[in-house]
Amino acid sequence: MFRRIVPVLGLALGLGLASQAAMAQEQSPPPPPAVQGTPGKDFTGVSPANLAGIMNYCVEQQYVSYDEGNPVLYGLSEKYKATEQTVGNFDYALGTAGYFDSNGKRFYLVAYTNEDDRRAACHAAVKAAQPML
């Protein structure tokens, strides 16, 4: 009797897991919209708060070193109040998620398919932030 139940239970369990995976896939949010062109790693039109968030993203993802990115992150955050606890800052939040707004367009750093390009973009962001400190 036990031999008859085990295959049926295994099949029921397998079907249940498959249906849960399909439901989870249906409920997951759509991917972010495609990048609106390649910014060429030009961060000249990016706000200081957005650059501070980008520095946070780049340091967390290890595209720039802690020693290189954190002084920029802290400097921009202090000077431009990018991380005010009571108010919050949308540009900083965007940057922390890897997004940046430049000249009216929104870009996503992960859209650079090559990790070396993402590193180069983060290093370009460090250079763009230097005059703002």
Swiss-Prot record:
Membrane topology summary: Peripheral membrane protein
Compartment(s) of residence: Cell membrane
Keywords recorded for this protein, A-Z: Cell membrane, Membrane, Pyrrolidone carboxylic acid, Signal
Residues covered by region (Disordered): 23-43
Subunit structure: The alcohol dehydrogenase multicomponent enzyme system is composed of a dehydrogenase subunit I (AdhA), a cytochrome c subunit II (AdhB) and a subunit III (AdhS).
Function: Part of the alcohol dehydrogenase multicomponent enzyme system which is involved in the production of acetic acid and in the ethanol oxidase respiratory chain. Does not play an obligatory role for the alcohol dehydrogenase (ADH) activity.
Protein name (database record): Alcohol dehydrogenase, 15 kDa subunit
This protein's record includes keyword Metal-binding: no
The keyword Membrane appears for this protein: yes
Organism of provenance: Gluconobacter oxydans (strain 621H) (Gluconobacter suboxydans)
